Regions:
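An accessory alpha-helical subdomain
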Residues: 154-243
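ADP-ribose/adenylate-binding Rossmann-like module
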Residues: 74-94
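Glycine-rich, N-terminal phosphate-binding loop of Rossmann-like dinucleotide-binding domains
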Residues: 58-60, 85, 130
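Short acidic-hydrophobic, aromatic-tinged amphipathic segments that line or gate anion-handling sites
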Residues: 42-47, 153-157
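NAD(P)+-binding Rossmann beta1-loop-alpha1 motif at the extreme N-terminus of oxidoreductases
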Residues: 1-45
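Rossmann-like NAD(P)-binding element
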Residues: 46-75
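Rossmann-fold dinucleotide-binding core
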Residues: 87, 91, 95-151
């Protein structure tokens, strides 16, 4: 049985796949009981949710630290706590600081969402950072994820955040900037321009909160932005010098 905290878009996606193999108890701060049942899970109190063998944290990272403080005294002493945040260094730090030492910790980042994985998980990537978890338990989880068609990538929180600062945070930064610029479909276009517009499609369904959080809580995101903006200014200087 799994306890799931946070019934947002990703929480619903997780239920759609995990409910095929597990009974899932869901706690959400708002009254979503009917929607939770319709999704295939059981609405529950925070206490019941935290008593499960595995607890999956699906809230925004901005709410994670306070949530950890609430659930710490409620967890099963041998529970496995899994987060799905798009950054890893700070969530791991908070889980280590705030949760009992007997609790196992697995930091994850599913590299997909409700739009890209609506029909299948086959070929989708998931990053795992095994922070405090018995080897046999970790291997069992890896085998289960691979059986669902997922490609498992094992790395450290710091390495994950360095790479995701470019592949996710910077991509969303460019996408939001293109939107602010007013980029749109044009009759006279190029394949390169179409690929730029695809970035808009990637970010348009994500919230501003997610955008802000992936930059605010990733210790490497600001540096990636600075380097990118510096490179753009250098290109502008180059053009000014030769035009």
């Amino acid at each position: 049985m799994i306890g799931l905290i946070g019934f947002g878009r990703f929480g619903r996606l997780a239920i759609s796949y995990l409910s095929r193999d597990f009974t899932i108890f869901v706690y959400n701060s708002g009254d979503r009981a009917e929607a939770i049942r319709n999704a295939g899970a059981k609405p529950a109190t925070l206490e019941t949710t935290c008593r499960q063998e595995t607890v999956l944290l699906c809230m925004p990272i901005s709410a994670m630290e306070s949530t950890l403080e609430k659930i710490a005294p409620l967890l099963n002493s041998q529970a496995l706590v899994i987060d799905v945040c798009s950054v890893k260094v700070l969530p791991v730090k908070w889980m280590r600081e705030k949760l009992p030492e007997t609790v196992s910790l697995l930091a994850t980042h599913p590299m997909f969402g409700p739009d890209s994985a609506q029909d299948s998980l086959k070929g989708q990537k998931i990053v795992l950072c095994p922070e405090r978890i018995p080897d046999h338990r970790f291997k069992k989880i890896v085998a289960f994820l691979e059986s669902m068609g997922l490609v498992v990538i094992e790395t450290t929180p710091a390495d994950h955040d360095k790479q995701i600062a470019v592949s996710l945070a910077l991509t969303h930064f460019i996408g939001r900037s293109l939107s602010s610029f007013g980029a749109e479909d044009l009759l006279v276009d190029t394949e390169g321009y179409k690929r730029l517009l695809h970035i808009l499609e990637v970010v348009e369904n994500d919230t501003w909160q997610l955008f802000r959080d992936m930059h605010r809580f990733n210790p490497f995101a600001a540096d990636a932005r600075r380097k990118f903006l510096k490179a753009m200014l250098e290109m502008e200087k180059h053009l000014k010098s030769c035009i």
